[in-house]
Amino acid sequence: LFPKKYLFPLLAFVVPLLVRVIPEVLMGPYVVGFDTMGYYVPTTLLWLHGGVSLWSFIATAPLLYTLTAGLALAGGSVVWVLKVLPSLLLGFLGLAMYGYARRGLGWSPKKSIVPALVGTLYFVALRVSWDAFREELALIFFFVVLMLLVAKAGGSGKFSWKRYVAFSLALAAVVLSNQVVAVLVLGVLLFTVIYKLVRESRIDAVRLIVFSLPAVLLFFAIFYLSPTVPEYRLIFGFPTTTDGWLALFGYSSYPAMLASEAGFFLYCFLPLLPLAVLSVRRFGNFQMRSFIVLILIATLVPMVSPSDLRIVMLLVYPLAFYATEGLSWLKSVHWKRFRITLLRVGLVYLMLVTVVLSLGFMVMTPENPFPYFKEGVNPYIYTIPTSMLQNTVSITDCQGTVNALQWLKDNMTGNSILLTHRVFYGWALTTFNPDQVFLYEFGNPLNAATTAAQEGYSQIYLIWWVNGKGWDGQPTVSSAFHEIYQSGEIAIYRYTPN
């Protein structure tokens, strides 16, 4: 018989994994997530072709790319590695959250499963798992760090080399996975050290400092080197440039930024707040409170890259614990006349909110989205997409993209170049060699074409949607580009200077 003590940990791993498989199956052979195709595919392919220096390797916080490149070298294609890995990451995140609730907070198995499922299946958590794999990998180790930070060795409180070495390794893994989550975990650690110095054991505080030093030094090395990798650059303030990417994510002023963040918070978490606010005073866990405070502090910093709204999404994890504690409070309230507890009402409400929103997010298409995510209701479609069934293009445009690129490969001559927006860059690298592709990021393809012409290319091509159907704030292309091939709503254009 299956040991009962393993039932809830198994559920914490298997349920999120199986749910995350759903959009992968519906997408067929294509990956899920903008960053998946826009960044993870091309970066992994470039690494496999030797296109990374030692310093760039360190600067990217390379743990995820080491995994994807290693698995691809072991025999899997990059695309299939990035179809299988997201489900596994979400499963391990559920298990890590369960472990923290069980061992770090001392909750019962039944209670511990609730934050593990809410923190992986609520639509905001699924949005993180849609393409933020580096953050997700870091969060797995984040909760391992918190568990080791709080749990006493063997319950005795004595010094344990194993626990502190594991703590140091897990902390380093966070830093090697994602810089934003690294800042949060180091912030929680700093608050914990200060608290121990003031209220508890100074010896424990010194031990934490000593065993944190390797990760701290690694963090500063990555921070120092990160400007060498353009896609991981930090952008603060309110840029006035007309760069296409900044036009989508930048703010005109500080009040506009705060208003956008407040609206985004309510859009994401209003369904969870009725339960979460019940435990604001009851749930006094120092690490979760520190987690929330640090995220709120980060949202006050005028930041465009990484997006401040993506940082707000990380509140789903502490709020999952607060909502669970809110349910515990409802357990003590009874309606004697109706023989029903508010706990049951709260559980049904939480299940309905999670299932309805998440299922709609996973199975509806971008062209026919669930009402809560459609444009007009959702003013944040560049952060919360209309559906999970897309990557850099909609599920309905994936085959057209493959057809267009294959046609161009069959018909492109020697001294030619393909111009690609970040949207089509990963797609192009799965078909062409890197030296046949010119990435112009989120900018103007006409400027890129002018540059390519000056570099001596005889034929300059562009892949984009047919005119009037373009995404990312560019519905049409310049008249200097003439359509020469179309598949569905995806077209190949040839540059002809006016």
List where the protein language model places each region.
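Membrane-interface transmembrane helices that cradle and orient dolichyl/undecaprenyl
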Residues: 105, 142-163, 280-283
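Extracytoplasmic
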Residues: 90-95, 128, 135-137, 349-498
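Membrane-interface helix-loop-helix junctions at transmembrane boundaries of multi-pass membrane enzymes
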Residues: 2-5, 156-160, 197-210, 273-295, ...
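Transmembrane catalytic cores of multi-pass membrane glycosyltransferases
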Residues: 20, 24, 35, 59-61, ...
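Start-transfer (signal-anchor) and selected internal transmembrane alpha helices
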Residues: 1-22, 207, 341-349
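Hydrophobic/aromatic-rich transmembrane helices and adjacent perimembrane loops
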Residues: 135, 183-184, 306-341, 346
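Active-site lumenal/periplasmic loops and adjacent helix-entry segments of GT-C-fold
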Residues: 9, 13-140, 385-395
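Transmembrane alpha-helix segments characteristic
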Residues: 10-17, 208-217, 281-304, 312, ...
